[in-house]
Amino acid sequence: MRLCDFAQEYVIRVGGSPGYAEQLRVLTKRLPWHVSDLTVDKIDRYLTTALQSLAATTVNNHRRMLNTLRKAALREGLLRDECIRPIRRVKAIFPEVRAWSHEEIKHLISTAKTLTGNTAHCPLSVFMPAYIVFAYTSGLRLGDMLAIRWDQVRGHRLSLVLRKTGQQHVVVLTDQSLAAIATLPRRGSGRIFGDLVSRRQFINHFRALVRKAELPGSSKFLRRSSATYAELSGIDATGHLGHRTADMKKRYLDIVILSENRRAVPALT
């Protein structure tokens, strides 16, 4: 049985999210393996080779997914491997997290208001400021931002099922974020942002906006900023982002912004 087919069946069987299914699809596309190839030795050799061309964090994710598929294959009797030692470790040092400060986000919004051109159904000078404010407030991923609908907004709450995890999630909205989306036209299936722009168009427009504003980063920085300022104000970023485990939030918190309330040591006298 081909590994790609087994991975697809595994996702369906365990009810995996679309995001997880896509990660497995990309990985198994790289590996023209069969299920019988999921031995410790072969996985070790792949990881060692992959480290020569891929980031350690990426290879570490590959290790995790291959180990999951290996365990599933062993349970179902599709794999025989008498090796009892664990798969080799991959030391992944996560890079320093960078988010946008409030001043940088305000500058980005000001720049967005000067944009010319349109999405398919809305001026960029209207769409982009609304998106930035709502994405910062909610901390949602791009896929969720493009999927949310008007009927999911109930007062100052937005209820949705996160596409990556399949978990129900509630976002607490501010007057500012509600006022931002009130400027947008309503169309089609009722998606707040997704009916106004495609994913590819959004990425291209946002990349151009960031360049014009002369800022580092991408739309992912809004999620990081949301997590960082949530934590800074006493809101647990784990629940705010919809993570299942608390350990994940460290990949989103900008420790420089978190240090805003810290004082320096007394100067030498």
Predicted segments — roles?
Residues 60, 79, 88-142, 146:
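Basic, Lys/Arg- and aromatic-enriched nucleic-acid-binding interface segment
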Residues 114-124, 171, 183-191, 203-239, ...:
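Short, basic (Lys/Arg/His-rich) helix/loop patches that form interaction surfaces
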Residues 36, 81, 121-126, 158-161, ...:
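Major-groove DNA-contacting interfaces characterized by cationic-aromatic clusters
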Residues 1, 99, 162-166, 241-266:
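Catalytic-site neighborhood detector that most strongly recognizes the C-terminal catalytic loop/helix
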Residues 4-53, 65, 69-74:
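Basic/aromatic-enriched alpha-helical hairpins
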Residues 36, 79-81, 92-113, 165-175, ...:
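DNA breakage-rejoining catalytic core of tyrosine-based enzymes
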Residues 138, 143-183:
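Conserved tyrosine-mediated DNA breakage-rejoining catalytic core shared by Y-recombinases
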